[in-house]
Amino acid sequence: LLDAQTTLLVNYDYRLRNFVKFAQQVEMESNGKSIDRNDKKVEYQTGSIIWGGYGPESQHSFFQHIFQGTKDMNKYFICSKSDKLNFKQMTAQIESLIEGNEEEKDIHKRTNISGATKVELKDLSPYSIGQLISLWENKTIFNSIFWNTNAFDQWGVELGKINTQKQL
């Protein structure tokens, strides 16, 4: 998990289709750091490249890479139980990741076995969306504490703003 350079976020409820953009902004802006709280260069990987999308639309774009590719990644699958078909589809995809198909005789059809984190919402309400946002914000800040970085400054972003002002 800690060595993975990317984090895949796939949601299986169309109403959450933009959640990956929120997660990208929160995590990458907060934890994209190379200097720790003691002003020392870190000697380990911090942050992660966040990517993903809406599951039913994503299956033919990047799921091949997930199942048979060579890159390791953290995988999060999010769905509400209220969307029954998509919930079953998500469950099947996670099951396929965990169990694989090592008994397949044709080696080129075999898939990698890997884990995934399933975030299951009872329904999609303002309360449950708030819980999901809070979960992601807490995950982000705890990673920052673990890496000893400051999640609340974004000097890389600020430099771009300063240089834009100079151009005006």
PLM segments and residue spans:
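A SIS-like phosphosugar-recognition module
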Residues: 1-168
